[in-house]
Amino acid sequence: LHDAHPHNRPDQMAIHPVVRVHPETGKKALYVNEHFTRRLVEMNSTESDVLLGYLTKWVANPRFTVRYRWTEGTIAIWDNRCTQHFVLNDFVGERIIQRVTIMGDKPQGNKPAWKPWIRPGRLSATSRHDRQLYMYLKSKKLIDVD
């Protein structure tokens, strides 16, 4: 469950694959972000938290990174479909950053092997993220309502 807004609004949420297939190269890439990816829908909240913690640390591993030496007039462009931006504040001087985001394709991946995790019953003890997932799936009519 990818949540671009912290106030549990279904219109600001989306479900997308954790591993997406790049539409032009066909290569696979992890598509998780520590700021927006809330949980893995095929797992309960506890399992999801553990795996997401691992994956968000994995994508920041230095062996997968590119360091860029900024000079005056430098322009950097990257493809967010297969890369992530991570700032190290190890520079001096002023930088002016202008971000341009192009609306892209809907992330595609392989067909999921599991179905979304649904709490065992309406009155079951669940985490906030489990309830958030349940409400999202219910609003999109992706599950049968109790």
Task: Please tell me what each predicted stretch does.
Residues 1-65, 75-77, 81-146:
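Active-site environment of non-heme Fe oxygenases that use a 2-His-1-carboxylate facial triad
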